[in-house]
């Protein structure tokens, strides 16, 4: 069955790397959480055997890398078993983690099982601010400890720093922290404002001046640290003239699998109402879902586009921008992403971002299974 699907799936090219969100459970309460607004409960999660079947199928259809993510992937007791199975079927494995639940013993077990790489998220460099953003006491201290263990176990390390108005001033120190931790790579990822982050946009949106300085610092550090630290940079696009080529275009270069087994064109895709996403629990193979499912084909390519995207010279470069952002801001995922200057809403969101960035709102609506908790006023 899988062999029959291999050739058809290659029409769009099975991605070399796939994101596996094995759980939405997470001890952190980050206000910019990229998981769907409606989280999958633990009772809906794929079982160990189901995830093993997924891993075997991914390897068979040509996937080379899997990224174990969440939520917090270490919340699953079977993570070592899953990593070992992935390694056994020839997959490169990366753990994307907050690190706060890890012990040195368990990290060592993961390394012995074949884990190839660790990516740890950091909310800042100063413990008070970092723990406040995470909504979790002593998180920053634990992250530093786990980063040290990672290098002691000779595992490559990526530092993921999610940036916003309240921590952008720490970027020079974050770059230095990455060097001090002997990280191979730093991902400077500005918050993307959909899903839960949209609820906290007024507390997170940077000013234009902050973003310009952030870009300057990244460019300077890339040149200065060439060959020592690789730096990836993800910018927010509210202030841009052209939208980002989100995920390389819908259904073209990326898919992820949710805790409940849904195969998604991006981790925020379930925010678009009216789309039904196929599950690995269905009778269809993953390759069939990638190639033939209605959800993946809805916004794939350019045939779905309305004006001004339809006749735009950049339509096969940025593919109209982010479908999730278009839906969040306009109510129609087929509309031009308002980050684009050609969108009739572009000026509106630009001005709104400026107002929010200059505002005095700093309190977070924390992310949790209770539906969100507003940060106490005296803590903001």
Swiss-Prot record:
Q: What class of enzyme is it?
A: oxidoreductase
Tell me the CDD domains matching this sequence.
Radical_SAM, SPASM_PqqE
Is-annotated flag, keyword Cell division?
no
Q: Does the keyword Protease apply?
A: no
Q: What is its EC number?
A: 1.21.98.4
Q: Cite the Radical SAM core domain residue spans from the record.
A: 12-228
Tell me which InterPro entries the record gives: 4Fe4S-binding_SPASM_dom, Aldolase_TIM, Elp3/MiaA/NifB-like_rSAM, MoaA_NifB_PqqE_Fe-S-bd_CS, PQQ_synth_PqqE_bac, PqqE-like, Radical_SAM_PqqE_MftC-like, rSAM
* Cofactor descriptive note: Binds 1 [4Fe-4S] cluster. The cluster is coordinated with 3 cysteines and an exchangeable S-adenosyl-L-methionine.
In terms of Pfam families, this protein maps to: Fer4_12, Radical_SAM, SPASM
Annotated binding of [4Fe-4S] cluster, by residue: 26, 30, 33
Q: Which cofactor does it need?
A: [4Fe-4S] cluster
Keyword annotations for this protein?
4Fe-4S, Iron, Iron-sulfur, Metal-binding, Oxidoreductase, PQQ biosynthesis, S-adenosyl-L-methionine
> What is catalyzed by this enzyme?
[PQQ precursor protein] + S-adenosyl-L-methionine = E-Y cross-linked-[PQQ precursor protein] + 5'-deoxyadenosine + L-methionine + H(+)
Which NCBIfam families does this entry report, sorted A to Z? PQQ_syn_pqqE (TIGR02109), rSAM_more_4Fe4S (TIGR04085)
Assembly and interactions? Interacts with PqqD. The interaction is necessary for activity of PqqE.
State the protein's name: PqqA peptide cyclase
